Amino acid sequence: MNKTITPSLETIERNWFLVDAKDKTLGRLATEIATVLRGKNKPTYTPHLDTGDFVIVVNAEKVEVTGKKASQKLYRRHSGRPGGMKIEKFESLQERIPERIIEQAVKGMLPHNSLGRQQFKKLKVYKGADHPHAAQNPVLLNS
């Protein structure tokens, strides 16, 4: 009988990947990113451990959606105060804070617990083509 080997946190190797969001569909891009953040692309994947890699996303303002979602998709947030619900369309949020669009799409695809919050911290999203992580030597993610 074979024994299942659970990787220890010291043996997990974390790589850095770079993703260019220019002209990519939002949902398809988010699923690829979430898979890498969770570590499901590795043979050492373990559901209860954070085995994922770091992901850097550039050109967040150039991500696309299909159909009429650009004018119809709504993003909601609440201040916590009575009557504090704010509703914003995709187009206006893309002009104001384009990073938040990708962050919310990926966050919804990660586990909704402390492990998911830990994995989400490894996502770095930037508006333009520049990022401050050149020292990590990120590898371009095949997408």
Swiss-Prot record:
One BP annotation, GO: negative regulation of translation
Molecular functions (GO terms): mRNA binding; structural constituent of ribosome
Gene3D superfamilies: Ribosomal protein L13 (3.90.1180.10)
Highest taxon above the source species: Bacteria
UniProt-listed PROSITE patterns: RIBOSOMAL_L13 (PS00783)
UniProt-listed CDD domains: Ribosomal_L13
InterPro entries for this protein: Ribosomal_uL13, Ribosomal_uL13_bac-type, Ribosomal_uL13_CS, Ribosomal_uL13_sf
Gene Ontology CC: one annotated term: cytosolic large ribosomal subunit
Alphabetical UniProt keywords: Ribonucleoprotein, Ribosomal protein
Subunit structure: Part of the 50S ribosomal subunit.
Its biological purpose: This protein is one of the early assembly proteins of the 50S ribosomal subunit, although it is not seen to bind rRNA by itself. It is important during the early stages of 50S assembly.
Family the entry assigns: Belongs to the universal ribosomal protein uL13 family.
Name of the molecule in the record: Large ribosomal subunit protein uL13
Organism whose genome encodes this protein: Prochlorococcus marinus (strain AS9601)
Designated gene of the protein: rplM
